[in-house]
Design a protein with these regions (language model features):
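N-terminal "arm"/small-domain region of PLP-dependent enzymes with the aminotransferase-like
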Residues: 1-33
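Conserved donor-binding loops in enzymes that form glycosidic bonds
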Residues: 13-14, 106, 155
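Phosphate-binding glycine-rich loop
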Residues: 36-80, 94-97, 104, 128-141
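Conserved coil-to-alpha-helix start sites within the AMP-binding
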Residues: 87-92
Length: 159
């Protein structure tokens, strides 16, 4: 008979060592526990300084961050976004929220990442590129929709 362990495996256990407890208390005391407030501004400024960019935006989760990225790239309901068929649902939700159509590309057996050969094949057989105001615009032949983005998600995250 196998004896079950009673040892807890910590998963997403809050770690409020250091100043975190005070920061959480400050947020609760001031009522700023959502998308704005002094700590959000400090975080965005720290990211700007660390990365050397002019603008940074804090989002409530990865889905919102991906959606903002798609919006900033100009993706709209007249577009198609290509994504791997093995991905976290946030990627596809962000595309869906942008109004764009999703086209899934199979992943490579060795890496589980979007298969570049299949992507190239899909683009060569399903799209045409024209120049509008000296800028290339690639459209799906069947629908006429613009290829708004290719989202080659790293499926294994931080592993």
């Amino acid at each position: 008979m196998v004896k079950m362990s009673t040892k807890l495996i910590p998963l997403s256990v809050p770690n409020l060592n250091g100043n975190e407890w005070q920061y959480v208390k400050d947020c609760l005391d001031t009522g700023w526990i959502s998308s704005a407030g002094a700590y959000v501004n400090k975080f965005e400024e720290a990211i700007q300084n660390y990365t050397g960019v002019k603008y940074a935006i804090a989002c409530m989760n990865g889905t919102a961050g991906l959606q903002v990225s798609l919006n900033l790239a100009g993706v709209s309901s007249n577009d198609i976004v290509l994504a791997p068929n093995l991905t976290f649902v946030a990627s596809l939700n962000a595309i869906s929220y942008s109004g764009a159509e999703i086209a899934l590309i199979d992943v490579c057996e060795d890496s589980w990442q979007m298969d570049i050969d299949l992507l190239q094949n899909w683009l060569e057989n399903n799209t045409i590129t024209n120049f509008v105001n000296e800028k290339p615009v690639t459209r799906e032949i069947a629908s006429g929709k613009k290829i708004g983005a290719i989202m080659p998600v790293y499926v294994l995250g931080g592993f």
